[in-house]
UniProtKB/Swiss-Prot annotation:
HAMAP family per record: 16SrRNA_methyltr_H (MF_01007)
Protein name: Ribosomal RNA small subunit methyltransferase H
Transmembrane segments: none
Species whose genome carries this gene: Rhodococcus erythropolis (strain PR4 / NBRC 100887)
Residue ranges, compositional bias (Basic and acidic residues): 322-332
Gene Ontology terms describing biological process: rRNA base methylation
């Protein structure tokens, strides 16, 4: 079987592809030979690399692909055109799972057999200079994954109060110098509003102490992460998406989460771990009806990419992977 191809000129190597298949494949084939009758959600469709692999390997699988980026949906739908009779594409954030299932004619709970969340910024968004996600390239400060709605990163920088800027830098970027950076942003925008990434990167080089710059990675990394999360309300969307995804799984269904930073992984863990434990009072000789664990965790903590995977696909280096299988009906 062929590996996923490039699409629309964008080189795209799906992250942890074969590990995702190891985890999700058994749930797909348990429904029927070749995945006949099985439904999978790709909650972060992107360029469709993961989806192309699963559709190619499991000829009976129907895939529901979600993405908030209209350009990504266009490219993915073209890429997956050979599977048009087994795909449903929905323009939505990943917390729009319930609406996506309705469009596919499925109930919102216990109706799908595999779900993949490949979180963070897509390869295409990083590689498109004019999107403003990459601090290594001077570009308009947009950072919207869906460019049809919402504030841009420039508008956040130019309109937010000192307190709000410091809050998002500290909370979403875990930036030690959040207050100092916020003060410099306010001073600079009084002279000239922010429009491109180069001006922000220059400010961060000036503001973050030299000793920290030498040891803490690129000085813009945390601020750009914080702005991206704020602009796209990523964590709010994820907090709604994780329970919606878990609820959508049928008994025997499996889910894989790939997080690219600790904030995402904490959200996933906070929802997944409690639902994998019994709620029966301690000391009882038997499990009370409806109080047993809903899920079985399939990974030991958060798995990381192997050295070989990172060498072949450097974008897999920060990934934290968690997976689980539904083992009982939803709790009341």
């Amino acid at each position: 079987m062929n590996e996923p191809s490039d699409a629309d000129g964008f080189a795209h190597v799906p992250v942890l592809l074969h590990r995702a298949d190891d985890l999700l494949g058994p749930a797909i084939t348990a429904v029927g030979d070749g995945g006949e009758g099985a439904y999978m959600i790709d909650a972060t469709l992107g360029l469709g690399g993961h989806s192309e692999f699963f559709l190619g390997k499991y000829p009976g699988l129907h895939l529901i692909g979600l993405d908030r980026d209209t350009n990504a949906l266009r490219i993915a739908s073209e890429r997956l055109a050979p599977f048009a009779d087994r795909t449903t594409f929905v323009h939505t954030t990943y917390d729009g799972i319930e609406d996506a299932l309705e469009q596919a004619g499925l109930p919102s709970t216990e109706s799908v057999h595999a779900i993949l969340f490949d979180l963070g910024v897509s390869s295409m968004q990083l590689d498109e200079a004019d999107r403003g996600f990459a601090y290594s390239i001077d570009a308009p400060l947009d950072m919207r994954m869906d460019q049809t709605v919402g504030l841009t990163a420039a508008e956040v920088l130019n309109t937010y109060s000192h307190g709000d800027l410091a809050r998002i830098l500290s909370t979403y970027g875990e930036e030690r110098f959040a207050g100092k950076i916020a003060s410099e942003i306010l001073r600079q925008r009084e002279r000239e509003p922010f429009t491109t990434s180069a001006a922000l990167v220059e400010l961060l080089y000036r503001t973050i102490p030299a000793a920290t710059r030498r040891t803490g990675g690129h000085p813009a990394k945390r601020t750009f992460q914080a702005l991206r999360i704020e602009v796209n309300a990523e964590l709010d969307s994820l907090r709604a998406a994780v329970p919606a995804g878990l609820d959508a799984l049928a008994v025997g269904g499996r889910v894989v989460f790939m997080s690219y930073q600790s904030l995402e992984d904490r959200v996933v863990k906070a929802e997944l771990v409690p639902r994998s434990k019994s709620t029966s009072p301690e000391g009882l000789p038997v499990e009370l009806p409806g109080m047993g664990p809903e899920f079985r965790i399939l990974t030991r903590g958060a798995e990381r990419a192997s050295e070989q995977e990172i060498e072949e696909n450097p974008r897999s280096a920060p990934v934290r992977l968690r997976a689980a299988e539904r083992i009982s009906r939803r709790r009341a």
